[in-house]
C-alpha cells in the first residue's frame, strides 16, 4: 500500500482484531479451562516485518524453520543436547500448523531420515507451502489469522524460480533422485544445497543460534527463523522469535519397557512426547470400529466439543 494514511488505518484495524480475539469463543474456552480471569489478562502487540521476497502476487521466504535446542527423539548418533530443526519452504505458519517438514539435526545435516531412502523421500517431503497473497489488501481483518495466506503447490514455487539450492529432482526414468534442479521430474524439498553442499552455512548458523540462545536464557530454547537465499549464493538468516522450553516435567527417567503391560491403561508406539498432567479428572474415549469413515470426523469433533463443554460447565 503506497498511501501511508491507508497503511496506518489497516495497521490499526489489525491491532484491534488481535485485541478482539480475546473475546472469541475459543479464547474464552481456553481461559475457562486454564482458570484464568480475562479481566486480569494483559496483552502487548508486537509489529514485525515479514521475512521474504515478492514473487509475482506471492510473498514468502525460501526457508522457514523452528529450531529446538533439546531433541527428545534423537536417532542414530544424534544427541538430545544437539537440538533439532524443522525446515520448510515458505511461511513458517506451515510448520506451526503441522505441515510436512524436513527434520534435521544442525550437527548432523547429512543424516536426514526422510531423504535417506527413495520411497521415503517421495512420501515424506513437503508438497505444499504458504505464501502471503499480495492481492489480498483489506481492512476487513478476520478471526482466522491466515485469511490472507495462500496454500500453494511446489510447482508454483518452481514457476517462480524459488527452489534454487533447496530442491532435488526425481528422475522417473532412472528411478533416482538428483541433487539440484533438472528439467522434468518431480521437485522434492530436500534442502541439500544448504545442508550438505555448503551453498549457505545454515547448519552452522543454527548451531550458533541455539548456543547463544540457550546461554542467554540459561535453559533450552525454541527459535523461529527464516532465510532468503539469493541466486549468487548469498542470503539472510533472520531470527523471528526465541522462547524458553519449559521441560521440567518432560524428562523421562523411567525405563518404560520394564512396565508390565497388564498395568497399562493404554499403550501406543506413536506418541507426542513425555509429560505429566496431574489435574486430569475426566477422559473422553472415542471408540473406533471397522466401519469407521474419515468423512464422519467433523461430526465426531462436534460431539466431543459438546462433551467438553459439559465438563467445563459442571466445574
Label each region the model flagged.
Residues 1-315:
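Nucleotide/phosphate-binding sheet-loop regions of phosphoryl- and nucleotidyl-transfer enzymes
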